[in-house]
């Protein structure tokens, strides 16, 4: 167990000490006695804004936030310490919403017979872009815009021109400086709660040792690749929060030794969350669900999450489900990260996609139903687990069941920067251990090696013939080892595929053929695992299951499915 966990434990224990470590401030935007004067923040005269409390709170102080919808951007620049963190928490049982949207009233009926309403609109996001979009390309001409409109907390669909409008749409017309809205039920907007997103960030924590707990964040007008919540300080904690319905990413983590615990990242336009340089991130007991609702390009950045240049990040005991893209995506120079005891289900592309990164450990997860989208160019990238030019990985004791493909190796000529340097280095799959997994009932293949390289490295040296080129790799040199896995394919399902479909490619219907020719499997068996009822996600083993299957079962607690040991 890493030493920094003890610091997080101490941080959690501090919460039991009440206000003994510092002052307690109250925020209540609904109170008629609330004020943002310096002498506020008391029970009798609470502060009206969270921002005022964030400005005043110092190490050891506790900010209690009462019920309300807070329309502001909160920036925390002060720092606490390990012994005296700054704490911003919702009051017990309170529903605290921090929103990027403002309410708009005084709607006027627009020209024409349809129930379209208009209001002056002078806000322009991404003014540096010729089309107010990021990325500024034809694919993202609509997707990459930042505007959002909600009626009674339900988002409408955006169109680019007023003549494209229909029920349930809106148009932010920059040239006329008007916002047009058509309710999905043709109602009078002056009788409804109509909100439009005006703020691109909701919370930015620049200080260290800051704990934020129990808040709901929504409706930010954030641009692609930028989180509505930004944790940039060391040892910051986000706990029991929800980030939902952002235009882009729910949150971005960029500080070291941060903790994200029991949070929900759901229905965001591009990503649940992103992380860059978030070394020693602990992401635990969270839900990441149904992100990329706007349809950003999945080959660029979209889906459940994306981690870049992170070292020793841990994703554990969390659910990554129904994301429109990859469930978990490591991309560019990550080192020694861990995914363990997670439930990764129904993501439209890969469950876990590890791309040009080093030393990933994937252990004790349940990975089901991933990869069934028709994403263009996603060859070798729609499996339960994909190692894409990512060496020194260990994949152990996972249930990889019912995906498009089970376990994939994906290879091209790739480079990546390393942490702390911009210099690019070559990177490829080698020294991989895939051991004690149950890989079964995947549709197209249980194992597929997608090697799009010209040197034939995916084949044994003996099958390639003699080569005088010392830089030519062979399968033996890659040191890819499958140890003691359990495989099984049902009727009509593939077993073992090797090579890309547009080049030299071989199918191995049996484990014996796969093992005999490639010589990379040791101790594997091809048997029905004997699940009680996979259709209801009951992955307990029936009485006929053999010992080889039981040895490969995930260790510890995995959320959601029914597993051995009482899950």
Regions found by a protein language model. Give the residues of each.
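Surface-exposed extracellular loop regions of Gram-negative outer-membrane beta-barrel proteins
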Residues: 230, 237-247
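Bacterial N-terminal signal peptides
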Residues: 7-16
């Amino acid at each position: 167990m890493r030493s920094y966990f003890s610091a997080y434990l101490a941080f959690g224990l501090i919460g039991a000490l009440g206000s003994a470590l510092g002052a307690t401030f109250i925020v209540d935007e609904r109170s008629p006695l609330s004020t943002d004067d310096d002498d506020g923040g008391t029970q009798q005269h609470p502060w009206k804004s969270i921002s005022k409390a964030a400005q005043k709170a110092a190490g050891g102080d506790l900010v209690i936030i009462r019920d309300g919808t807070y329309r502001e951007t909160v920036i925390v620049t002060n720092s606490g310490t390990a012994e005296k963190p700054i704490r911003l928490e919702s009051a017990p049982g309170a529903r605290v919403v921090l929103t990027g949207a403002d309410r708009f009233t005084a709607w006027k009926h627009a020209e024409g017979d349809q129930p379209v309403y208009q209001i002056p609109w002078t806000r322009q996001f991404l003014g540096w872009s010729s089309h107010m979009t990021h990325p500024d390309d034809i694919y993202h001409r609509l997707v990459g815009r930042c505007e959002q409109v909600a009626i009674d907390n339900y988002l409408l669909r955006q169109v680019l021109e007023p003549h494209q409008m229909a029920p349930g749409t809106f148009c932010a017309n920059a040239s006329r400086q008007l916002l047009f809205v058509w309710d999905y039920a043709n109602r009078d907007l002056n009788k409804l709660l109509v909100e439009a997103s005006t703020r691109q960030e909701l919370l930015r924590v620049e200080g260290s040792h800051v704990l934020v707990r129990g808040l709901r964040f929504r409706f930010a007008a954030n641009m692609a690749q930028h989180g509505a919540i930004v944790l940039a300080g060391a040892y910051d904690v986000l706990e029991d929060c929800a980030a939902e319905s952002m235009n882009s990413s729910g949150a971005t983590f960029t500080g070291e030794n941060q903790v994200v615990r029991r949070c929900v990242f759901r229905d965001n336009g591009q990503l649940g969350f992103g992380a860059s340089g978030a070394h020693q991130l602990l992401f635990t007991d969270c839900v990441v669900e149904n992100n990329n609702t706007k349809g950003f390009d999945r080959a660029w950045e979209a889906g459940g999450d994306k981690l870049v240049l992170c070292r020793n990040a841990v994703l554990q005991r969390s659910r990554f489900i129904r994301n429109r893209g990859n469930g978990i995506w490591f991309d560019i120079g990550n080192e020694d990260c861990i995914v363990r005891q997670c439930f990764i289900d129904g993501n439209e592309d890969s469950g876990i996609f590890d791309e040009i990164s080093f030393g990933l450990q994937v252990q004790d997860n349940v990975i089901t139903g991933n990869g069934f989208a028709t994403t263009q160019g996603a060859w070798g990238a729609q499996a339960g687990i994909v190692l894409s030019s990512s060496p020194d990985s260990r994949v152990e004791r996972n249930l990889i069941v019912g995906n498009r493909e089970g376990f994939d190796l994906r290879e091209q000529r790739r480079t990546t920067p390393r942490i702390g340097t911009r210099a690019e280095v070559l990177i490829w799959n080698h020294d991989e251990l895939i051991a004690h997994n149950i890989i079964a009932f995947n549709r197209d293949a249980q194992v597929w090696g997608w090697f799009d390289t010209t040197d034939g490295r995916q084949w044994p040296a003996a099958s390639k013939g003699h080569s005088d080129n010392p830089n030519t790799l062979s399968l033996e040199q890659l040191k890819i080892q499958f140890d003691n896995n359990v495989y099984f394919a049902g009727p009509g399902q593939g077993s073992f595929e090797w090579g890309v479909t547009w080049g030299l490619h071989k199918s191995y219907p049996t484990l014996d053929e796969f093992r005999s020719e490639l010589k990379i499997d040791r101790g594997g068996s091809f048997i029905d695992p004997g699940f009680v009822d996979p259709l209801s996600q009951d992955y307990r083993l029936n009485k006929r299951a053999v010992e080889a299957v039981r040895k490969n079962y995930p260790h510890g607690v995995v959320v959601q499915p029914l597993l051995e040991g009482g899950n």
